[in-house]
Amino acid sequence: MKHYTLKPFQLESKHISQIHNIIEKVVSEKRDEYWKNYTDYSVYDQTMITVSTINDEVKAFSSIYTRDFYGDDVYRLFNRFLVSDDAREDCGSKMYKGDHRFLEMIDQQVKYVKTLNPKFYFLSRQRKNTRWLRWYFDKYNKQYNENMVVSDKQYWICKGNEYGCCQTLIYPKDKIVPFKSYK
């Protein structure tokens, strides 16, 4: 699996089409718990897109994203991560040919966002159980010589309800979280 992190306009049209096909399937089937998150997704609203390909076909993607709510120079990484159905078995949720399939994707995004001199950058997840997140990011930190930490509490990352907007953050240990904590 190869990973490429590009500005939206740098993506090949076939890759944009493949991303849209993955999204369309998720939205039309409504089986993914978060399918509604993809109804208004636009490749062109993202700061950068990372695609994971096998034989030049997109099998997974995620993006670097910012919004007014975050404040200036704050970026969300690993935004809207999806894997195509035909790659779920090959790529699995964890590994592809012995490598954790999304760690390189995350590292490419971390490296890129650092070039922007950000005030803060983060990944977030709606789930409160952090055991697996801590395991993955311990592995990530060792493999890529980084210092990402998983928050002990949840933070408001958007205007909305508690379920969708209060999330666990993964962020650099030396950065100060700019969001209000939940409870």
Regions found by a protein language model. Name each.
Residues K30-V83:
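A conserved beta-strand-loop-helix scaffold within acyl/acetyltransferase catalytic domains
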Residues Y121-F137:
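Conserved beta-strand-loop-alpha-helix junction that forms the acyl-donor binding cleft
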Residues W135-D152:
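Conserved acetyl-CoA-binding loop of GNAT-fold acetyltransferases
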Residues V83, E89-V113:
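Conserved acetyl-CoA-binding loop-helix of GNAT-fold acetyltransferases
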Residues T47, T115-K119:
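Short, high-confidence coil segments that cap the C-terminus of an alpha-helix
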Residues Q18, I22-V26, Q108, Y112, ...:
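Charge-rich, solvent-exposed alpha-helical interaction surfaces
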Residues V149-K183:
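C-terminal "cap" of GNAT-fold acetyltransferases
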Residues M1-K36, V51, K183:
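Short amphipathic alpha-helix that is part of the acyltransferase structural core
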